[in-house]
Amino acid sequence: MAKKEHVSETPATAMLKANGVPFTEHPYEYLEHGGAQHSAEVLGLDPFTVVKTLVMEDEKGRPLLVLMHGNRTVSTKNLARQIGAKSVQPCKPEVANRHSGYLVGGTSPFATRKEMPVYVEESILALPRIVLNGGRRGYLVGIDPQVVVQLLGAKPVQCALAE
């Protein structure tokens, strides 16, 4: 029997454990610029269920997190309209790191450095289970999607565009 690969705890998994949230671990070989498509492929998962955590900011530089399907992009115009902002754009990697405390490619919505509003593509909440970043490059965790609403107060939005 293959030995289960152990991954050391991250702030994200510590938060999940502290809140009694059951999760599965999915370590994989990280590929620079591989994104959610790569991790889905390597782990044999549907990219629609692999959720990426995107650090964005509004026109005033206020940070926010967007949870999006791995095979979709964010319509920043639709997102801005739904959250009452003039505009929204992705943060530069160093700014995203400053806000979240995580490296790009390893950003989890859990236990971020700064508390930020979290928005989740509405269709994600209808899935039975999702896989998202566990706080380290090459490390995903599987959870019930309702956890993002319960723990983070994530608000549903409709801003997905097919890639």
Predicted regions located by residue number:
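Extended, low-hydrophobicity, polar/charged segments
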Residues: 1-163
